[in-house]
Amino acid sequence: MAKIIQLSDDLSNKIAAGEVVERPASVVKELMENAIDASSTVVEIDVEEAGLSSIRMIDNGVGIDAEDCKLAFQRHATSKIKDENDLFRVRTLGFRGEALPSIASVSHLEMKTSTGEGAGTHLVLQGGKIISEKKTSGRRGTEIVVTNLFYNTPARLKYMKTVHTELGNISDVVNRIALAHPEVSIRLRHQGKVLLQTNGNGDVRHVLAAIYGTAVAKKMVPLHVQSLDFEVKGYISLPEVTRASRNYMSSVVNGRYVKHFPLVKAVHEGYHTLLPIGRHPITFIEMKMDPILVDVNVHPSKLEVRLSKEQELHELIKQGIKDVFQKQQLIPSASVPKKAPMPAIKNEQQSLTFDAKKGNTNEMETPLSYEPEPLESVVYETNQMSTYGMPVQEMTGASSPVFREDAPSERVHKEESAASLEYEESVLREDDAEAISENERVPVMYPIGQMHGTYILAQNERGLYIIDQHAAQERIKYEYYREKVGEIEQEVQEMLVPLTFHYSKNDMLIIEEHKEILTKVGVFLEPFGSGSYIVRSHPQWFPKGEEAELIEEIIEQVLVEKRVDIKKLREEAAIMMSCKGSIKANRHLRNDEIKALLDELRQTKDPFTCPHGRPIIIHHSTYEMEKMFKRVM
């Protein structure tokens, strides 16, 4: 008796649906991609109970011809590709011909479609089988309603998350597709409540504002670099705007949102030490390339891709981001509380609000008598910021990057007009031009004194500056050590008393395997008995008293990483040395020492953050100070 049988179409579609339709968000993604491929300029999505009850998608695309409607629900039937050559030059979002049959096989599906010429078609399917077909009248476009999702696959239904989680996944998908296609007007509603509305004018800045709020959108700067093979453009947040999750980082390849970790890594390397440890920027990066350089036929979900010349693209993104921030003045401003009537005192914790509007510099009075003579400065005001790296919406408990029903301030059509966003960005561009022309990213500051032996207070005609003295010297020393450590030199310092290090036999095998790498960084290990090494010299740049700890740290990196990145090793060594050798808290400095420290800081390449990404300088403008003291209203 034969053991191998041909699976039925119904069972085959259910198996395929397991890969294509993982959750309601998968249905939304596939239907939106079909709508965009159909040249739609308006797409409306209505969901009930996070899509488990109903998903309704309406578009104004080209529609489907009557003779093609039934075929559209057959597996691997598509209008996107014709032959094998097309498969390697995919220019559409869909191409596999699996979405509609997979969705229909695990739901009740109803479709009305019309090309605008003659009668349209109305199909009703259950479990992938057509149970009703009739002609209908209607405008050009397609309407698809999916209900009772996973009704015939209870195992999949059992593993669905909460309504809030599934709705968050849907919002995430819609938001990223909206970013990838700002030329399409997209509206997402849940239970009749609008979660996202974009205007489809083609300006991605307005989509960013609609998703993250204008306060965040104003703190994002444009990125645009290109090479012979790649064009990279988008918007990246200033280092002061960070999140605890990578979910706020969006990558788009030829109009397709993708998840590709090497691209995320390139962005992080571009920010380098500007980001605090464990924090991530908000970014939207769109990459355009010849379709032959990208393979999208990796997984049925089409989220994964393989890229040719990936290292070239990696370097282009990394260097592009570095170049952007070299032209920016990155001193974050302190926030000013929003003016509001005094609330009644209650026996409960009161929430804080912040003023999102920027002070008008034209209203600033002439410098007060205690200020030095006016200096030319490149400092411009930034907007709503509660603490470094934590914008207001994070403090109010909005943790999801995409679904925040309780954060109306993050919706541009409810907060500020698009004209306001454009005006603010034009102001930032003017300030950038000033910074470039004056070639002075950190203004001259005049020391006032110290606070708690930890923070330096300084001033100029623009207001008050608070400088973390440890972070400032850490940046100075880091750049010094990074240059020294970065040099491949064989100069070593002999030690009067050799150092001994003990390791297990397994660790010694790893060390022996990577001994050549250790030698390149100036660490020479000699076997010394069983399970021990002796070191008689060290690189000349090692600071006195730190030799043993540095050597141990370098060897530990070899043991943990297995494959050692020498550049990363030297980077970590420079960070460690700069941190250990910098001024500690409660160290009181003389005014001449403070002035020397500030002068050295101004000479560094990245004077705004320490090597760990913490801010060095916080700015309180004169206007903000006067507003707090009610000198201006």
Swiss-Prot record:
The record describes the protein's role as: This protein is involved in the repair of mismatches in DNA. It is required for dam-dependent methyl-directed DNA mismatch repair. May act as a 'molecular matchmaker', a protein that promotes the formation of a stable complex between two or more DNA-binding proteins in an ATP-dependent manner without itself being part of a final effector complex.
GO terms (BP aspect): mismatch repair
PROSITE patterns in the cross-refs: DNA_MISMATCH_REPAIR_1 (PS00058)
Q: Name one GO molecular function term.
A: mismatched DNA binding
In the record, the note on similarity to other proteins reads: Belongs to the DNA mismatch repair MutL/HexB family.
User: Mind telling me which InterPro entries this protein's record contains?
Assistant: DNA_mismatch_repair_CS, DNA_mismatch_repair_MutL, DNA_mismatch_S5_2-like, HATPase_C_sf, MutL/Mlh/PMS, MutL/Mlh/Pms-like, MutL_C, MutL_C_dimsub
Q: Does the keyword Hydrolase apply?
A: no
Organism (species) = Bacillus pumilus (strain SAFR-032)
Q: Which UniProt keywords apply?
A: DNA damage, DNA repair
| Protein name in the entry | DNA mismatch repair protein MutL
Per the record, its GO cellular-component terms are: mismatch repair complex
